[in-house]
Amino acid sequence: MATPTELGFSSPGGGGDDSDDNPPQKRTSKRTASETATEEETKKKKKKKTKHNTKMASPPSNRIWNEEDELSILKGLVDFRAKTGLESKIDWDAFYCYVKGSIHVKVSKCQLMSKTRKLKKKFLDQMEKIDQGNDPHFTRSSETEAFGYSMMIWRKIDAEYTNGVMDKAHQSESGEEVFEEDEEVALIDKGAAKSGKSPHEAVVVVDKITTKKNGTAGKESDDDDDDVLCAVRDAFETTMMSQGLSDYQKKLQLEKLMNLGTGKRRELSNEWKALCVEELKLNINKLRFSAKLAEAANDGK
C-alpha cells in the first residue's frame, strides 16, 4: 500500500503541473515563427523600396536623338535634295534651318552634321553585310523606313565603301565640315553671308560659284552649262544604256546630244531633273507603304 508521501508525489496535481509547462513552449515557438515571417516581409519591402529609389535617383540618359529624330533627318535630307535639286551637294546651313523644326530637341548644326555622318556609316555597314550574304533583319517598321531613306541618299557610294574607299570627312577653311565624293557640302561663302542673305536665300550650287582666295563669291561661269551637260549625260546613261545599243551607237548618240543647241540641252536637262524629283517622291510613297505593310505583318492584324 502506498504511503501518503508516494500518493502526494504522484497526485493529479503534479501531473497537472507537467501538463501546464508544455503549452507555453508551443505558443512561444509559434510567436517566434510569425515574428520571423513578418520581419522577412518587412526586409523584402525595404529592399524593393530601396531598388525603386535607386532607379528613380539614377541620372538621366545622355541620349539626344530618338528614332523619330533619325527618320526626320533622313526624310528631310531626301525632301531637301528633291526641292533644291542638289543631288550630291548639300548646303548645311540651309538644311539645318529646314529640318531643325522636326527634331524634338534643340541641336546645333554641328550635332546635326555629326548625326548624319553616323547614320551614313550605319547604312554603309549594313550594305557591307548584305554584300557578304547577310540579309538584314529589321524588327521595327522604323528600321525598315530608315534603311529605305538611306538607300535613296547614299546608295551611289555603297560600292566605293565596300571596296574600302569610303570617303572621309575633312574641314574646309571656313570651318564647315565637308564630305568628299557624292556627299560634298555646298558651303555658303563668307562673302555671300556678309551680304545679308538668309540661309534659305543663299542655297547655291557649288558648281555655279567661283570662290576667290579672299572668300568672296565670283560670278557664274560656264559651269552652269557643264551642269546642263551632266544632266543630259546622266539622262542618256540612265535611260538609253539598257536599250541593247552597241558601244559605237551609244557613243554616236551621246555625241549628238552633247552637240545640241544650248536651249535644247537646257530643256532636256530641266525635264530630266523634274522626272528625278517625281521619282524621289514615288520612292518615298513606296517606302512609307512598305513600312506600313511590315508593321501590319508584325502586328498580325
UniProtKB/Swiss-Prot annotation:
Basic residues composition-biased segments: 44-54
Compartment(s) of residence: Nucleus
Stretch list, region Non-canonical leucine-zipper: 268-289
Cross-referenced InterPro entries: GEBP (IPR007592), GeBP-like_DBD (IPR053932)
The entry's keywords: Nucleus, Transcription, Transcription regulation
Pfam families on file: GeBP-like_DBD
Transcription listed as a keyword: yes
Disordered: annotated segments: 1-62
Expression (tissue specificity): Expressed in the apical meristem and young leaf primordia. Detected in the vascular tissues of cotyledons and leaves, in hydathodes and in the septun of siliques, but not in roots.
GO biological process: regulation of DNA-templated transcription
One Gene Ontology cellular component: nucleus
Main location: nucleus
Family: Belongs to the GeBP family.
Entry function: Probable transcription factor. May play redundant roles with GEBP and GPL1 in cytokinin responses by regulating the transcript levels of type-A ARR response genes. Involved in stress responses. Plays a repressive role in cell expansion by counteracting the positive role of CPR5 in this process, but does not regulate cell proliferation or endoreduplication.
Subunit structure: Homo- and heterodimers. Interacts with GEBP, GPL1 and GPL3.
Record protein name field: GLABROUS1 enhancer-binding protein-like 2
